[in-house]
A protein has these predicted regions:
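Active-site-proximal specificity loops/subdomain of glycosyltransferases
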Residues: 42-76
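GT-A fold catalytic core of metal-dependent nucleotide-sugar glycosyltransferases
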Residues: 70-120, 143
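A glycosyltransferase accessory/donor-loop signature
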Residues: 10-18, 37-39, 45-48, 141-235
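Short catalytic/ligand-binding loop motif for oxyanion handling, primarily in non-cytosolic enzymes
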Residues: 23-25, 94-96, 101-102, 119-121, ...
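Conserved catalytic core of nucleotide-sugar-dependent glycosyltransferases
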Residues: 104-165
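Short, well-formed alpha-helical segments that are part of the catalytic scaffolds
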Residues: 22-34
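Short, Lys/Arg-enriched N-terminal segments with co-localized hydrophobic residues
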Residues: 1-9
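Short, solvent-exposed loop/edge-beta patches enriched in aromatic
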Residues: 10, 35-40, 77-85
Length: 235
């Protein structure tokens, strides 16, 4: 008689918004996630040519990136099952993503960092308009309980207004939005966000050090170290 113990390996399903003007940011972020994770991670870029059969929304001048709205396709891409994490590509993971994964709470449809601030500038990277609205940057880092995000069908994501999507009007109540520590989406050089030594995830929301205009922003030295590691080839 043999007793078999089956250990289920839980994969952390992670989606990163891909922006063709910030290719290096995507690569360094993906590397930083893998480097610091103690659990297996699957990383899927939300790259528009890959999802054009379902995501057909036209980009407008208020869409600062190619993934401004396609991020809300994550539940559909997960077949509305399990959990998925969405991240903007202009971030750098310093903590263990497995620690975040342990914070999942099934009573919520989405868990995120509830920022309470208003950007000072009217423009950000590449001269893009800095839009100002309630729940600004909440959707830039979302832990999504996909079976509770069933309203996010391709038809809805393709047709809803930006505010309906980014202010989570597709949920019955804000009570379905769980709170995560701000250190998981630390906004670089924004009001109220000083440079801390202990943060889990840095977000270069104004523009990152891969742009010459932001080469000396806070945490630029940290990003450059990861970039150097990511680019190094052993010979």
């Amino acid at each position: 008689l043999y007793l078999y113990i089956v250990l289920m390996v839980v994969l952390i399903n992670l989606f990163i918004g891909y922006y063709s003007k910030e290719k290096v940011a995507f690569s360094v972020l993906a590397y930083s996630i893998l480097r610091n994770s103690t659990k297996p991670v699957t990383i899927t870029p939300i790259y528009l040519p890959n999802i054009r059969d379902d995501f057909v929304r036209e980009r407008n001048n208020l869409s600062s990136t190619e993934f401004s709205f396609s991020r809300f396709m994550v539940p559909h891409l997960m077949n509305y099952k399990g959990w998925g994490l969405f991240m903007d590509c202009d971030q750098l993971m310093l903590g263990d993503i497995a620690e975040l994964w342990r914070l999942r709470d099934d009573k919520y449809a989405v868990q995120l960092c509830k920022h309470d601030y208003t950007p000072v500038e009217d423009k950000k990277f590449l001269g893009q308009v800095q839009t100002k609205y309630e729940k600004k940057n909440w959707s830039s880092f979302m832990l999504m309980n996909c079976n509770k995000c069933s309203e996010l069908t391709p038809d809805y994501v393709n047709s809803a207004t930006g505010l309906q999507l980014h202010q989570f009007k597709w949920l019955e109540s804000d009570e379905l939005i769980g709170d995560l520590p701000l250190e998981w989406n630390w906004l670089v050089d924004e009001p109220g966000y000083n440079t801390k030594s202990k943060v889990n995830n840095i977000h270069f929301t104004k523009g990152g050090p891969w742009f010459k205009e932001y080469a000396n922003c806070s945490y630029s030295e940290t990003w450059n170290l990861y970039h150097e590691e990511c680019s190094w080839i052993e010979r």
